[in-house]
Amino acid sequence: MTHVLRARRLLTEEGWLDDHQLRIADGVIAAIEPIPVSVTERDAELLCPAYIDTHVHGGAGVDVMDDAPDVLDKLAMHKAREGVGSWLPTTVTAPLSTIHAALKRIAQRCQRGGPGAQVLGSYLEGPYFTPQNKGAHPPELFRELEIAELDQLIAVSQHTLRVVALAPEKEGALQAIRHLKQQNVRVMLGHSAATWQQTRAAFDAGADGLVHCYNGMTGLHHREPGMVGAGLTDKRAWLELIADGHHVHPAAMSLCCCCAKERIVLITDAMQAAGMPDGRYTLCGEEVQMHGGVVRTASGGLAGSTLSVDAAVRNMVELTGVTPAEAIHMASLHPARMLGVDGVLGSLKPGKRASVVALDSGLHVQQIWIQGQLASF
């Protein structure tokens, strides 16, 4: 089946094309071509690659860790509403048996498919952290790194485990990083008190970047650059960024752009309160409170976010001054490259999957097509 989507402006990796159309065949972009002069209708103001959210714990009142049959479908529809065409359900620190169960459910969803945004695999955030910058993760459940245990996680996930987060100062971390990379698993560094030197050693071992840059890690000091300094200055490192203006000050967001504009991966780190009213929710098994859209633990620490990807894109434009094209790439092309799926996702290009979002001039989501099919909200 072939159909055409026409836009006043269409975003490619190279930039905007005015008055162009996508020709889509069997869920794949077959061609990008000028709209015939005789055709005046447009399907969208802006056609862009659908967003990829690589770090999602929950939303719409549900959590990835919930053992219920419709949780991932509900979350996938929630993500599609914010312009996300594909995503990684993300686990949290919990008993190993609970993590295994979540990874199995995610693997099953990958295999069977379903409504909404496509599930690309899983992201393991915890239990391989250290206590100093634990965030909302319960330190009593932190575990040591063992190759056999990592292999078991990969096996339980039926090889759908895409990302493992860990603290690079843990014993055995460098060996674990090398092993995970051999298994084609990405490694992100976070919830850690690592030094600049320890972080650089982890990048040398193959680690891919930082978990929500600035949050849950050693900050930048002029005599001890810490994890943030290592990430900002190492061109090998992808930098996850929660661009809600609460987790990271706009000036620090701008600094990230100055140092690493081509390496920023916009994430939501969203938890079950995303898209919901203020009130009490749970994260990592603990009660948290959302007020004014900001979620905090009982001790006052930030506990995940309620951010949407489309809002993150708008925030980057408004708060840091990057162009709309640059911000959109941070939420599409960059995460695709980080995951190694940029051959099929992340930009509008012939041969890639037709994962497409229509935006208005204010970068608000109007419609989304996932593998060429219009998603209904």
Swiss-Prot record:
The active site is at 269 (proton donor/acceptor). Binds 1 divalent metal cation per subunit. Substrate binds at residues 136-137, 215-216, 223, 244-247, 302-304. Its cofactor is a divalent metal cation. InterPro entries: Amidohydro-rel, GlcNAc_6-P_deAcase, HutF-like_N, Metal-dep_hydrolase_composite, Metal_Hydrolase. SUPFAM superfamilies: Composite domain of metallo-dependent hydrolases, Metallo-dependent hydrolases. It catalyses: N-acetyl-D-galactosamine 6-phosphate + H2O = D-galactosamine 6-phosphate + acetate. It is an enzyme of class 3 (hydrolase). This is N-acetylgalactosamine-6-phosphate deacetylase. It comes from Escherichia coli O157:H7.
